[in-house]
Amino acid sequence: MIFKFSQKALVALYLVVGLAEAVPSKSRVVSRASTFDYNGIVRGVNIGGWLVLEPWITPSIFDNAGDAAVDEWTLTATLGQDQAKAVLSQHWSTFITQDDFQQIAQAGMNHVRIPIGYWAVSSLPDEPYVDGQLEYLDNAISWAREAGLKVVIDLHGAPGSQNGFDNSGRKGPIAWQQGDTVSQTVDAFRALAERYLPQSDVVTAIEALNEPNIPGGVSEAGLRDYYNQIADVVRQIDPGTSVFLSDGFLSTESWNGFKTGEDVVMDTHHYEMFDNYLISLDIDGHVKSACDFGKQIEGSDKPVVVGEWSGAVTDCTKHLNGKGVSTRYQGEYANNVKYGDCANTTQGSVADLSDQERTDTRRFIEAQLDAYEGKNGWLFWTWKTEGAPGWDMQDLLANGVFPSPLTDRQFPNQCA
């Protein structure tokens, strides 16, 4: 789900340079038959940590499995097929239910983005993963239909790992684009598309691949070729479905001219805790950074949705940098500078935050909402956690920190 390496600083360089030419911020895609027009505004949330596990979202699952379980691959390998299937089935059936979708709709949102791994549809030899996720994804589509929500299906993990992050299913070296991994990914994507794109009243978009890591070694030319293959698959099945394309941790405007006008939407992610400079900012600096990012994405010649972002400004959440990995904020990881204390923010509820922390979080969230709606909207990461203040929209809403209604502002015009 998230950017977890120091090369975020490289990406920041792309975002602070001025645009060489002005590009209209509301460039339109071609006329479409879809039930959602992505020239408009997306307001939604990710259903993270459900069908693709992440240690920081559900730390209890990983902590109960022992030290070796650091991602879904090692979790299932450690538990074995039978126990892993039992543990995950219990999680899938209880962590997210129809009531969550009703709450999301009642909060005023129009979209959910649902991550799914290739292993849910394409079992490969000698891999420990268990399947069974599609039954729950089927349920989610039905729940979204009843709630009046649109769905972006997000291929979140590819064979070999496209980014080396635990959210790809397997933490470690990036092996995607080696051997048959790209063709295997296309096969998995096609299986998802054939199953879900016919439900175009609800599934209005599908994402080619989450966070392929170009700064980390993924070939940009190879990624563009993969995107072309994916677009062909979608057009063969349902030409009315939009395709979300990750920017690969490059600037969105670096993709200008690529598949422009072809019903594609750029997906960019913005976090301010995985980089030593950004994590050092005070709240005024975080607000300015978010507003500046919103101005930068206006340079894209395609619709842009900020498909992941949060209210957090530190990396204090337990396991956020990886299971058992310490924090930048307290000077324990990737630097020797201490920026602050993680007291009350490692685990718990938004209610446990100080009044000032809640106020600052509200300011930061409002600034991002305004910034991202300057282009084509947003999908917050994530709906629910086991206790990660700043990341848990359900908890933020319940404690009055996430705006309700979504247009309510206690701190108006921050990006003016």
UniProtKB/Swiss-Prot annotation:
Gene3D superfamilies: Glycosidases (3.20.20.80). Residues 1-22 form the signal peptide. Belongs to the glycosyl hydrolase 5 (cellulase A) family. Keywords: Carbohydrate metabolism, Cell wall biogenesis/degradation, Disulfide bond, Glycoprotein, Glycosidase, Hydrolase, Manganese, Metal-binding, Polysaccharide degradation, Secreted, Signal. Beta-glucanases participate in the metabolism of beta-glucan, the main structural component of the cell wall. It could also function biosynthetically as a transglycosylase. Disulfide bonds join 291-415, 316-342. The active site is at residues 211, 308. The gene is exgA. Monomer. The lineage of its organism: Eukaryota, Fungi, Dikarya, Ascomycota, Pezizomycotina. It comes from Aspergillus fumigatus (strain ATCC MYA-4609 / CBS 101355 / FGSC A1100 / Af293) (Neosartorya fumigata). This is Probable glucan 1,3-beta-glucosidase A. Glycans are attached at residue 344. It catalyses: Successive hydrolysis of beta-D-glucose units from the non-reducing ends of (1->3)-beta-D-glucans, releasing alpha-glucose.
